[in-house]
Amino acid sequence: MLDKNNHPDIVHKMEMILAQDLNSDDSATADWAKTFMDGFETEFKNYQPDRKVLDKLKKHATEVEVKVIGGNWCSDTRREVPRLCKVLYFMGVSADKYSYFRVDKSKKPVDNDFAASRTIGSVPDIVVYKNGVEVGRIIETPRESLEKDLLALLK
């Protein structure tokens, strides 16, 4: 894991969410959570977002909220969520404006939460809000890059 004293709150928040599944009685759930957690730091550190796009995104930091529906078992989720966390961190988005909601392999919500109110097709389903209004989604993989797709949604 990243140094607990020197890493973004948004990453710590994800670690806390994944830790719930690490302690699951269901060994498959625990195994997928471990796989996700083990790769999270590497994906977060290695992703190099476009700095010019990040500079444009920073002006939206206080306007944006992101809710992600994902599955620990999903390779797209395990790749895109750490990258998204890095983009949000460099944008200056507060960790309390980021939420992650888990679904199982049949895409049923793990908890009775935001995911339960949505029709879930592909994951991750990244739902982007600007000033409390949903402005769009990035589903499964970005069209260009996470930061470019976010900028297009927030303009």
What kind of feature is each model-predicted range?
Residues 100-122, 128, 153-154:
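Thioredoxin-like thiol-disulfide oxidoreductase module
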